[in-house]
A protein has these predicted regions:
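Conserved CoA-thioester-binding segment of acyl-CoA-metabolizing enzymes
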Residues: 1-54
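Glycine-rich beta-to-alpha active-site loop
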Residues: 83-129, 158
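Acidic, divalent-metal-coordinating active-site segment for phosphoryl/phosphodiester hydrolysis
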Residues: 156-163
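C-terminal long alpha-helix characteristic of the crotonase
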Residues: 114-119, 170-216, 229, 246-249
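Terminal low-complexity tails and localization/encapsulation signals of metabolic enzymes
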Residues: 236-249
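Glycine- (often His-adjacent) and acidic-residue-rich active-site loop
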Residues: 4, 31, 45, 53-86, ...
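Hydrophobic, secondary-structure "cap" segments at the distal end of domains
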Residues: 138-147
Length: 249
């Protein structure tokens, strides 16, 4: 079954729905996921995206036998992951059980990664004879650092949940029983923020991490928030000690 999409209030949820195969992704899943991200980007009211999966495992990556076919068709796994990273809304990956192969890059493309203490990760590309794609290599280095990237890609070492938290793969860690509460808390926090600075700072922080910062674009986005109704609302809510009602303008 292809990944599902649910939109509710300010939150979009993308769910991987192939638990019997450890949520391994197939060729038809790639354009489906890209289409979900496109729809989210067009929904002005969506502020947070939760990427999750059914069953014991988050995702076992992509069917290795389909890698060549997906490249030839022009809709590669890497393009799908890039779409997740460039999503306008803030993204949260909810990782339980195992996250393997390309699925590790899917998670790294998200802004936050909330992991269960029963999780583990494994990048078997070198063991399988596959050279990972450029954007994925870059993401590993930007997010985790060169030494950790080499450790994972070149030795194919498995990491426990605690090791994943220690190296920065997980931004949050919770027991299986507390995982959903942790996700709900983070989602509520993010969805309550003012959309203009939330989206703008996410975008520019990612560009800065890649050495692609645009000073003029940052200045324009700063000015846009200074002139926004939401800045006035935020100040009023602070003075009146009430939750702000941001409108994204």
């Amino acid at each position: 079954m292809q990944p599902g999409l649910e939109l509710s209030d300010h939150i979009a949820t993308i769910t991987l729905r192939r638990p019997s195969a450890a949520n391994k992704l197939s060729p038809e899943d790639l354009p489906a996921l890209i289409a979900h991200i496109d729809r989210i980007n067009q929904a002005d009211d969506i502020r947070v995206v939760v990427l999750r999966s059914e069953g014991k495992y988050f995702c076992s990556g992509y069917d290795i036998s389909e890698v060549r076919n997906s490249q030839n068709k022009g809709s590669s796994f890497g393009e799908m992951v890039d779409a997740i990273e460039h999503c306008r809304a803030v993204t949260i990956a909810v990782v339980q059980g195992g996250v393997y192969g390309g699925a590790t890059d899917m998670a790294l493309a998200c802004d936050f990664r909330v992991g269960s203490t029963d999780a583990e990760m494994f990048m078997p590309a070198a063991r399988l004879g596959l050279h990972f794609y450029q954007a994925g290599l870059e993401r590993y280095v930007h997010r985790l650092g060169l030494d950790v990237a080499k450790r994972l890609f070149l030795t194919c070492e498995r990491l426990t949940a605690m090791e994943m938290k220690g190296c920065g793969f997980f931004t949050h860690l919770a027991t299986p029983q507390e995982l959903q509460a942790q996700v709900d808390e983070l989602t509520a926090t993010l969805s309550a923020m003012a959309p203009l600075p939330l989206f703008g700072m996410k975008k520019h922080l990612n560009l800065i991490a890649r050495g692609l910062q645009d000073s003029e674009a940052i200045a324009r986005d700063v000015l846009r928030t200074v002139q926004s109704e939401d800045l006035q609302e935020g100040g009023a809510a602070w003075r009146e000690k009430r939750p702000p009602a941001f409108k994204g303008r």
